Regions:
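A broadly used, surface-exposed interaction patch
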Residues: 54-76
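Coupling/hinge elements of helicase-like and P-loop NTPase modules
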Residues: 98-113
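GIY-YIG nuclease catalytic motif and its immediate N-terminal context
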Residues: 1-50, 57-58, 80-91, 114-116
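Short, intrinsically disordered/low-complexity patches at protein termini
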Residues: 68-71, 79-81, 110-112
Length: 116
């Protein structure tokens, strides 16, 4: 499945801590997301699904996610229909091995293009 991963204005990756969750873009935005850290060895910190602005807001206050903040935290998301989300999240978790989160949907993975 080919999905459109979102970037912020200027075609740059969105910083987790400052992306404007009040922007109209987030109204009714549901799907999957990826949070990663920068630095010399960038890595995926968390993947998930749901109402994007709510999930991002939650992870801004999650100590496990914020432990990687000194490396720079970034987020991207894609709108995915509800019936595909579990499979897409399962694929992302298997492919990206996030550092935080251990319970992912036990379903057949649905492969999607990665944002990088």
């Amino acid at each position: 499945m080919n999905v459109k991963w979102i970037k912020c204005n200027g075609e740059v990756w969105c910083p987790l801590g400052t992306v404007n969750l009040s922007h109209a873009h987030f109204d009714n935005m549901e799907g999957v997301y990826i949070i990663w850290h920068g630095g010399n060895n960038p890595a995926t910190v968390r993947v998930g699904q749901g109402i994007i602005k709510d999930r991002i807001a939650e992870h801004r206050n999650d100590p496990q996610v914020q432990a990687y903040a000194p490396l720079g935290l970034f987020v991207t998301w894609a709108s995915i229909a509800t019936n595909y989300r579990n499979g897409v999240e399962a694929f992302l978790a298997a492919k990206l091995s996030p550092k935080v989160g251990e319970r992912f949907p036990n379903v057949v993975p649905i492969e999607v293009n990665l944002p990088w």
